[in-house]
Amino acid sequence: MVEDRLISGIEACVASFSREVSTGKESEIFLVDLAVKAAGRSVKIEVLVDSEQGIVISQCAALSRRIRDMIESDDELQEVYGEVFELMVSSPGLGGPIRHVRQYIRHTGRLLSVRYRDDAGSVHDVTGRLIEVDLAEGHEPFLVLEPVRSGRKKNGSLPPSRLKMMLDRIDKAVVQVEF
């Protein structure tokens, strides 16, 4: 399928670009999300990339040029997508859900709203400061949140002072914008 070819080509562009510009694991650029959508007569290709240190606009622009060149130099992709496609390469930005486990590292110290399942399978919502992230091999990856009271309620109980959550039990995590 041509869309699979496009996706694997974009993944390869991100990987090769990352190898060229990265100075270590923290600056390694990774693909967060990729969406291909029909937009009238054209196609919109949205590529979200990030690194543990964050990504700058000049890197997004350079990666966008590389992806566009890849599409335009591939006869099969050119035939399907033609010259009428919109390509957007950017970082995920604040306020959206975390989609890649390595994004947690970048957001250490920030406030997160998390929906997670406990050992019994019950769903809980908590807002807290991301204190620690452990993605090391040899054990299940986890994070540690320090819950904060949200809203104006004075009563009500907070969860324990720190919550350790396995990443596979997190249904959704969103970085909260603080002022």
From Swiss-Prot:
Q: What's a single GO CC term here?
A: cytosol
Q: Which domain of life is it from?
A: Bacteria
Q: What Gene3D superfamilies has UniProt attached to this entry?
A: RimP-like superfamily, N-terminal
Q: Please tell me whether the keyword Ribonucleoprotein is annotated for this protein.
A: no
Annotated HAMAP family: RimP
Q: Please explain the role this protein plays, according to its UniProt record.
A: Required for maturation of 30S ribosomal subunits.
Family membership = Belongs to the RimP family.
| Name the record gives this protein | Ribosome maturation factor RimP
What gene does the UniProt entry assign to this protein? rimP
